[in-house]
């Protein structure tokens, strides 16, 4: 009992450190601060928790329920404790991210444990490196570095990063059974939780749910050919894999829902070869931004794993086959969807993750395989962890901020409170209408503080208890605020 408690105690410390590091990262180093019109809209607008035909985002059940619920928790639970509204939103969002990322790392740890039976120490080294790869994957000398847990603003954290994390958690959980060739014989409670998570994963984002679909589709292809090899019938295959076939069917249904939504209608562009070509160029440019250090370590690790697998005549080729299958499906899907929507999407780390994560997983699992086959090689684990911790801290201009236009979070904080003070002053004076001064934005609609955001920010402040009534707000761009806060006017 003593050794087992120490074993669990070490794991608790390890994952506790991951959780704490993410909380610190997203509250102090790179705070998740609301800033633009989308943030103020999505903090309070709560949708039905089912896909809705004809809605602007028909299938975004996960982000469009979690974000406003987090906003309510921030306003009515965290805000009274910390005494700062914007900090409450930042802390709540950081806790959500820390919880999901910690779960993601734990499920990866359990997958490695189940597949390779590594020592606790070796598994922690592999998991720590897997965690660091999400930060060290890209490198830029002269501009802020993107990372796989980052995005363009707080809304996109909830709408892209979190859906990707939920999909990855489901994939890692399913993979722990598939690798062991075990059936999903779960208790009713666990089965219901799994189905709920699959529901949220599929009905989250059409650029993120490909993670689950690519994995399940690849598993089905492998099982199908194995079934044919055993001279099995089609009916038996369908019956034996009804669960995974059902996941693909629901995913396809979700795509149909999404294709008839308001956002798809607004895009209104047809697929074209030029669009696919432009998307492909941006896709290749993203690959070109991958850190040389990560690429070298990845190539050496994968090569060592392949060499060992070849010598031992084991089934390591199945992992490569799964990697190629998931990567190919994800790449083709993203190229086509982004070419239809906007080629620039694929140049975002929160979208590119749906493709590149398979390579990151292959690198980490290959390292685990090498540690399993060559026990003494574990000594390089701490060296690699230290190396990438240092690399993460050496980025040319640090990590990209999760704010629109990469405005420093401290400046966003000051502007937010300027807006809050203006609106609360009008509320104290009993006004039902007001003019809200905001920084001057772009020429189209004054983004990131668009002229149409007045009703949205008023509704959010009213729902969160900052004002006593809804106020009709007219947005007035003011260049003086740009000078005051040293922000450039967007072009």
Residue spans of the language-model regions?
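Membrane-interface junctions at the ends of membrane-embedded or membrane-associated helices
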Residues: 2-6, 114, 175-190, 221-238, ...
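Intrinsically disordered, polar/acidic, low-complexity terminal segments
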Residues: 2-65, 79-126, 376-491
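Alpha-helical transmembrane segments
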Residues: 9-26, 126-133, 193-198, 242-251, ...
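Transmembrane catalytic cores of multi-pass membrane glycosyltransferases
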Residues: 27-91, 95, 206-350
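Transmembrane alpha-helical segments
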Residues: 100-112, 166-178, 213-222, 299-306, ...
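Membrane-interface micro-motifs in multi-pass membrane enzymes
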Residues: 122-176, 333-366
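Membrane-interface alpha helices of multi-pass inner-membrane proteins
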Residues: 189-217
């Amino acid at each position: 009992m003593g050794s087992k408690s120490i074993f669990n105690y070490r794991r608790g410390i390890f994952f506790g450190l991951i959780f704490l590091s993410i909380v610190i990262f997203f509250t102090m180093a790179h705070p998740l601060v609301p800033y633009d019109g989308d943030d103020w809209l999505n903090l309070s607008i709560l949708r039905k928790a089912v896909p809705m035909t004809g809605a602007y985002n028909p299938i975004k059940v996960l982000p469009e329920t979690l974000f406003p619920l987090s906003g309510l928790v921030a306003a009515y639970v965290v805000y009274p404790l910390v005494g700062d509204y914007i900090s409450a939103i930042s802390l709540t969002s950081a806790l959500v991210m820390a919880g999901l990322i910690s779960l993601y790392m734990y499920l990866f740890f359990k997958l490695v444990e189940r597949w390779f039976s590594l020592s606790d120490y070796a598994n922690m080294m592999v998991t720590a490196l897997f965690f660091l790869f999400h930060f060290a994957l890209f490198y830029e000398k002269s501009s802020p570095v993107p990372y796989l847990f980052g995005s363009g603003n707080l809304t996109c954290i909830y709408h892209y990063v979190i859906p990707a994390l939920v999909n990855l958690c489901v994939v890692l959980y399913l993979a722990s059974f598939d690798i062991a060739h075990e059936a999903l014989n779960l208790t009713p409670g666990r089965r219901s939780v799994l189905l709920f998570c699959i529901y949220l994963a599929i009905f989250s984002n059409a650029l993120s749910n490909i993670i689950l679909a690519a994995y399940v589709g690849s598993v089905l292809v492998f099982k199908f050919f194995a079934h044919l090899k055993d001279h099995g019938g089609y009916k038996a295959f369908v019956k034996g894999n009804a669960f995974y076939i059902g996941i693909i069917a629901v995913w396809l249904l979700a795509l149909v829902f999404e294709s008839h939504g308001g956002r798809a209608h607004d895009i209104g562009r047809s697929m074209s070869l030029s669009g696919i070509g432009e998307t492909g160029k941006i896709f290749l440019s993203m690959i070109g931004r991958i850190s040389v250090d990560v690429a070298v370590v990845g190539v050496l690790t994968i090569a060592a794993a392949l060499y060992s697998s070849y010598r031992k005549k084991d089934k390591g080729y199945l992992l490569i086959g799964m990697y190629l299958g998931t990567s190919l499906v994800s790449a083709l899907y993203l190229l086509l969807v982004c070419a239809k929507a906007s080629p620039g999407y694929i140049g975002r780390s929160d979208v590119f993750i749906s493709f590149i994560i398979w390579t990151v997983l292959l690198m980490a699992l290959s390292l685990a395989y090498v540690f399993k086959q060559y026990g003494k090689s574990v000594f390089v684990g701490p060296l690699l962890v230290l190396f990438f911790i240092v690399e993460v801290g050496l980025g040319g201009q640090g990590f990209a901020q999760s704010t629109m236009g990469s405005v420093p979070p401290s400046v966003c904080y000051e502007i937010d409170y300027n807006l809050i003070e203006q609106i609360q002053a009008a509320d104290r004076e009993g006004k039902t209408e007001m003019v809200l001064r905001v920084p001057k934005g772009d020429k189209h609609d004054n983004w990131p503080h668009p002229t149409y955001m007045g009703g949205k920010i008023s509704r959010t402040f009213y729902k969160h208890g900052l004002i006593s009534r809804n106020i009709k707000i007219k947005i007035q761009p003011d260049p003086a605020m740009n000078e005051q806060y040293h922000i450039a006017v967007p072009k």
